[in-house]
Amino acid sequence: MLYLILFLIAPIYAGLIFPTKPSSDPFYNPPKGFENAAVGDILQSRATPKSITGGFTPLKIQNSWQLLVRSEDSFGNPNVIVTTVIEPVNADPSKIASYQVFEDAAKADCAPSYALQFGSDLTTFVTQAEMYLMAPLLDQGYYVVSPDYEGPKSTFTIGKQSGQAVLNSIRAALKSGKITNIKDDAKVVMWGYSGGSLASGWAAALQPSYAPELGGNLLGAALGGFVTNITATAQATDGTVFAGIVANALGGVANEYPEFKSILQSDTDKKSVFDEFDGHCLIDGVLNYIGTSFLTGDHKIFKTGWDILKNPKIGKVVEDNGLVYQKQLVPKIPVFIYHGSIDQIVPIVDTKKTYQNWCDAGISSLEFAEDASNGHLTEAIMGAPAALTWIIDRFDGKQTVSGCQHIQRFSNLEYPNIPSSIANYFKAAMDVVLHLGLGPDVQKDQVSPEGIKKLGSIEMRWL
């Protein structure tokens, strides 16, 4: 099916002048003296070189821009990120949705600022598909801001880099009025699923100390398939059809921590392994590593296996980038978590631990909507209506829960007061997924190797 679709759309792409990839685009390079700018400053800007994509046709919006923003890495070293600002038709300049995509790759040319452009590489399908989640935000009249939160080194799974980038992107958006017409006192809600929840969650947790001035702008954060322990996700997916997530994660960590890379490289006979880890976007990474065991079993790539975590340097990297371990970092803004009980990719146990950590620390408003009937893949769709309802309520000024509330429902489609138009929009997407024949039980993340090869077609059907 995927090959047939690619054949059919090839003539469309043949006539395109493709957007320049970040690795070859000088716009992504920091200007001289950039380190003297304050974090969140706009260093340069431009209209997106190509239209924002709605799949294989440009999205109907009012305008879109890219901002080059001063940020910093995990160690406080100055760097730059690009953030994409999308203005819908009939936009409300007082409302911003900061949407963090699940890029999940250690390759610069997978960045959302590139992937969201019409004509971007087919390996960025997954990010293009997330426009299905962003579109309802635009329909509400919200500006959508989507940062390249992994930064110039593509540091997938790295917490501080990601969270700081999200906050600096928001700072820049609030300063962009002369370019975008966004008000400097605009209200902001953050949203992310899976890898995007990692970035959004770290942003929410870091905000009180890193960007306290945003406290008056931020209305809350919605975190779905919430990643708080990168090791747990690696253990859940290693050796499975989703093992490519482990490869991409190892590449992302290695991009930020050279010593991490050196230690693991010395633990394998496959000396080119890290050269491959940063060569894939999410979908082609998953396809390339189906069933590969990196740290598990008798035929693992890294000889020490999971005992590598006993190395103090490796253990510290893992702990420093797991939000579940950062008990001192507690959001001051309202937070909404939604997660599937039977998630086999991001096990819910560490999400529950993080929820409890924040509750024990006295968080003012934390709502946890647990979905009993969906795993990671399908909760991205079935949980979205609840997240959107919560986001709309924040912009409408409705009351949040007081303290902590954890409710398990059979499905998060049962969340109160979901608009019927939003529910039907996502039910249609779910019907498409369930009829693709991805495996024994896609709602439980049970996907076959053959099913993985069909995943590329999901984006085609959605968009």
Curated annotation (Swiss-Prot):
It catalyses: a triacylglycerol + H2O = a diacylglycerol + a fatty acid + H(+). It comes from the Eukaryota. InterPro entries: AB_hydrolase_fold, Lipase_secreted. It is found in: Secreted. Its EC number is 3.1.1.3. Induction: Cold-activated. Expression is induced in medium containing Tween 40 as the sole source of carbon. Expression is up-regulated during the yeast-to-hyphal transition. Expressed during experimental infection of mice. Expressed in host cecum and infected mucosal tissues (stomach, hard palate, esophagus and tongue). Expressed at all stages of mucosal and systemic infection. Optimum pH is 5.0-6.0. Glycans are attached at N229. Fe(2)+, Fe(3+), Hg(2+) as well as ethylenediaminetetraacetic acid (EDTA) and phenylmethanesulfonyl fluoride (PMSF) strongly inhibit the lipase activity. Surfactants such as Tween 20, Tween 80 and TritonX-100 show also inhibitory effect in the lipase activity. Sodium dodecyl sulfate (SDS) sharply decreases the lipase activity by 85%. Methanol, ethanol, and acetone have also negative effect on the lipase activity, with residual activities at 48%, 24% and 44% respectively. Finally, lipase activity is almost lost in the presence of isopropanol alcohol. Residues 1-14 form the signal peptide. Belongs to the AB hydrolase superfamily. Lipase family. Class Lip subfamily. PANTHER family: LIPASE 5, PTHR34853. This is Lipase 5. The gene is LIP5.
